[in-house]
A protein has these predicted regions:
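Patatin-like phospholipase
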Residues: 1-60, 68-308
């Protein structure tokens, strides 16, 4: 069965990378959201089961991390991170925050565990061999603007750009890359639809971490993040203050594309309410299972959309 799944996936990815004058460029967008992204992990595993592939993949924060496993063809890897490893205090804990200044153990998650010889390593060769483009933002802490990383910025056993895209302000220290510091990509571009369209995507499949119809309110805890960041990173504070505006603009644009038949979206039902830092494996498993179920139930709709 594994061989059959792999064959279908390789055939689809080869087709995705083959080009052609009449063919539309189809992009996959995976929203961030910390542990809420267990939902998109389930959807992506269902995509792998059916050999569903895309020309271009854009992910934000944990959504970018999910995409790396998906593009490497490592089914169930994301589920293990959300549903098994999450109980390890090195993954997520107040102990981490006290010891390192980061609630999430980004070096542990995307370094120690992910590197060759780690507990659950990424198949780096498979990721690099995949013809699909991969783009994900991180926020330059000094400017508050998005920098878009690609697969070319990743090196074997060096996944700092992924860590940077997941470094939530206040909850995590910024990640240093070549002398510059970066925070979570969601601060500057939570839904990089504009980037996707600029790069040539004409059709979009979007996986959200929040319920259908969600619009973002102004950032909460403003006094906390302003006090923590304003002296060193005032432009990051400014980006946080306006994050909801760019998010809602992108969301409304996706909805317009959906009405025009150029976008297809998946979103959790809202029945399972979790926070970004939830650590309950049973809740994570339920959210993941819902993602698998939703994707399977809508597989014909998805395939019809991709073939139009």
């Amino acid at each position: 069965m594994q061989t059959d799944t792999t064959d279908r996936r390789e055939t689809c990815w080869n087709r995705a990378g083959s080009g052609g004058e009449q063919r539309q460029k189809v992009g996959l967008l995976v929203e961030g959201g910390g542990m809420k992204c267990a939902y998109s992990a389930g959807v992506l595993d269902a995509f792998l089961d059916e050999g569903i592939a895309f020309d271009y993949c854009a992910g934000v924060s944990a959504g970018a991390a999910n995409l790396v496993s998906y593009l490497a063809g490592q089914r169930d890897r994301n589920r293990r991170y959300y549903c098994i490893y999450v109980k390890d205090p090195r993954y997520l804990s107040t102990r981490n925050f006290i010891k390192t200044g980061s609630l999430f153990g980004l070096q542990y998650i995307y370094g120690d565990m992910t590197n060759e010889g780690g507990e659950d390593p990424l198949d780096f060769d498979a990721l690099m061999a995949n013809p699909s483009e991969l783009v994900f933002p991180a926020t330059d802490a000094a400017t508050g603007k998005a920098r878009y990383f690609t697969k070319r910025d990743l090196r074997r056993n060096h996944y700092e750009p992924i860590m940077a895209s997941c470094a939530l302000p206040v909850m995590c220290r910024p990640v240093e890359i070549n002398g510059r510091y970066y925070f979570d990509g969601g601060v500057s571009d939570s839904l990089p639809l504009k980037k996707m369209v600029k790069d040539g995507c004409t059709k979009i499949v979007a996986l959200f971490s929040k319920p259908d119809g969600f619009l973002m309110k102004p950032q909460g805890h403003r006094r906390i993040y302003t006090a923590a960041l304003s002296r060193r990173f005032p432009n990051t504070v400014e980006a946080l203050n306006h994050r909801h505006e760019q998010y809602n603009r992108s969301m409304k644009r996706i909805r317009r594309m959906e009405q025009e038949g150029r976008a297809l979206t998946f979103a959790p039902s809202g029945e399972i309410r979790i926070k970004t830092s939830t650590r309950d494996p049973a809740v994570m498993q339920q959210l993941y299972d819902n993602g698998v179920r939703d994707a399977r139930e809508r597989m014909k709709e998805l395939k019809d959309f991709l073939q139009k």
